[in-house]
Amino acid sequence: QHWSTWLHDAVRKCAEYEMMVDIHDEYRPTGFSRTYPNLLTQEGIHGNEQVPNADHNTMLPFTRFTIGAGDYTPGYTRKDLQTTFAHRLALPVIYYSPAQFLFWNEKLTDEHKRPELDFWKNIPTVWQDTKFLLGEIGEYAVVARRSGTTWYVGGITNTNARCLQLDCSFLSSDKKYIATIYTDDVEVPGKIKITTRKITLKTKLSFMLQRS
């Protein structure tokens, strides 16, 4: 009670000085950001710092993220992470947070070795539309979010591999799209395969998600 009051006072003070806030550790959303939108996000989550597995990650969209934005402290190249690279790349779409920070664990000069990081550079953090397309708690989740006329779709599975079919009927009927698709490269473990294809709202895409 005491420290929650202290935090709320701090958020108010930061608002006076037009400073944004990202609260870490145990604090969870209370709706306070509705009054003070400078409170962009908060941790209050068992995130990448604790190195959770994919079973845990597929529970979060149905539990923690139903009450507000969450800073999952996403990592990407840490050697101890228990998920695939495509799983990690999908999280900023599935997990809502107006402030997204990628915890870098390699030299910045190695960035050219990871061309998929362009996805991280360009992904929005706020959205005009959100659709939960597929999911089962603790099993898998597929979320689509729109910024402007561009859609982003993220899909993850738990520690079991599975095939999922994406129905693209959420797309606009009067548009044709070019989809850039990021998947785990089954021929080169630890790498991301990037492909492009034309799609419309009538397209159905099948994906084989690797375990974790």
State the predicted function of each range.
Residues Q1-Q82:
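Aromatic- and carboxylate-enriched substrate-binding clefts and catalytic-loop regions
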Residues F170-D184:
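Solvent-exposed beta-hairpin/edge-strand motifs
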Residues Y72-E111:
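Charge-patterned, long linear interaction tracts outside catalytic cores
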Residues K107-Y152, D185-K191:
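Glycan-recognition and catalytic regions of carbohydrate-active enzymes
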Residues M19-D25, P98-T109, L117, W127-K131, ...:
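Acidic/polar loop patches that form or flank catalytic/metal-binding clefts of enzymes
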Residues I137-S173:
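Carbohydrate-binding surface patches
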Residues T196-S212:
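C-terminal beta-strand-rich structural cap/linker in extracellular carbohydrate-active enzymes
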